[in-house]
Design a protein with these regions (language model features):
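N-terminal and secondary-structure boundary signal
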Residues: 2-395
Length: 395
């Protein structure tokens, strides 16, 4: 029987109450404590081992995130990168080319929520005296998107950086070069997902030019998601059917979607992720990532630890860090530092710049990944209690 709207929200509220969540548009900022099981307490064996917490490979090193506040977007970005220059240079020297992943092709020409020309200029200002090129600049799309370079004004920036041998490209249109990821669909069946070649090329140094904004599926999006969701291959040229896009395989339900994003980050990050840059000069709140409203925040963040820069970004937005599933999975797998106590923030203090971002109207649904799956199958196998049956006839 189909659930009514009233029953749906009643169930969502019950899940939220059980987890101690606050779903009132504004939320607390402290991360929720990990779910643990008290010694001797009964728990559903379908939930797996009760001592899983101690086996997660949490990142044990300190990370550095620059947080700059100022009235010039370009300078904010540049200063954020200079502040972590000592961490960038060693990795940058080892790579053959840089790829700056912008954010904007799918924003239908709306500058809010997209990588601004001044943000790109700030990144190139930093690179110009430190890297001789080539530098590829671009975004991904679900079809031909070269018009984006002029649509968003990125092409006007290129003329000032001829030494970098700049080239714009749509990164996920090349059907002949890709990396293969095995994710899961809505029914938890394994599915192959093709990721664009640039995103799995060990010769590349990837810079994520993300934007501080809320999201309609994963609560918030910044540096990590900009690369993860830029990687899936688009349909072949001439095919405008979104169903044939690899990106669709990440939009397969709130649980599978978060998990597939984590899997993609786990595959790509060790290969070539260089710097996570987040432009928060004008953030987006409400129904992001494309239909939200502006927040005059006037900040920029950067780090070589993508998880850490997103963690600080969440704090600046006043969002509970335990809410984005893909980031929490990445932390549990040791992909970066997510513990604020182990992140050194240089520049402005978080408390000085923090704002409360209004979240997407569907945030209560997004948080259902945290609750129990209500359609779990019957217990089978080793976790099931042995039945008192006479099986001697089968011996």
């Amino acid at each position: 029987m189909l659930a009514t709207r009233r029953s749906f929200f009643a169930r969502a509220a019950a899940i939220a109450t059980a987890q101690g969540l606050v779903l009132k548009g504004q939320q607390t900022t402290a991360p929720a404590a990990p779910v643990t099981h008290a010694p001797g307490k009964q728990y559903d064996p379908r939930m797996g081992t009760s001592n899983a917490e101690k086996y997660f490979k949490y990142y044990d090193r300190r990370s550095k995130v620059s947080l700059i506040k100022g009235d010039n977007r370009r300078k904010n970005i540049y200063d954020a990168l200079v502040a972590i220059d000592d961490q960038i240079r060693p990795a940058l020297k080892a790579k053959k080319y840089v790829f700056v992943k912008l954010n904007g092709v799918e924003a239908a020409g709306r500058l809010l929520g997209s990588t601004q020309p001044d943000a790109l200029a700030g990144i190139l200002d930093y690179l110009a005296p430190r890297f001789k090129g080539p530098v590829f600049v671009g975004d991904s799309g679900d079809g031909p998107g070269n018009k984006a370079v002029s649509q968003f004004g990125w092409d006007k920036v290129f003329a000032d950086y001829k030494s970098l041998k700049l080239k714009f490209e749509i990164t996920n249109e090349d059907q002949s070069h890709y990396g293969l990821l095995y994710g899961i669909d809505y029914d938890l069946h394994v599915i192959p997902i093709r990721l664009g070649g640039r995103f799995v090329d060990p010769d590349a140094f990837l810079i994520s030019a993300g934007v501080l904004k809320t999201h309609n599926m994963v609560v918030a999006t910044m540096a990590v998601k900009n690369l993860v969701m830029g990687a899936p291959l688009a349909p072949a040229l001439g095919n405008s059917n979104y169903a044939d896009s690899e990106k669709r395989k990440f939009h397969v339900g709130i649980r599978s979607g978060n998990y597939n994003m984590f899997l993609a980050a786990q595959k790509m990050l060790p290969i070539n992720w260089g710097i996570g840059v987040v432009d928060g000069y004008e953030g987006m709140e409400g129904n992001g990532p494309m239909s939200g409203t502006p927040v005059g925040h006037r900040i920029a963040l950067a780090s070589t630890d993508f998880l850490a820069v997103d963690r600080v970004g969440l704090e600046c937005m006043g969002i509970d860090a335990s809410w984005p599933g893909y980031l929490n999975y990445a932390y549990q797998a040791g992909l970066g530092q997510y513990d604020l106590k182990k992140i050194d923030v240089v520049g402005a203090k978080i408390a000085e710049v923090q704002k409360k971002y209004r979240l997407h109207a569907d945030v209560d649904r997004m948080l259902e990944w945290r609750g129990p799956m209500l359609d779990l199958p019957s217990n089978l196998g080793r976790n099931r209690r042995r039945e008192d049956q006479d099986i001697s006839a089968y011996a």
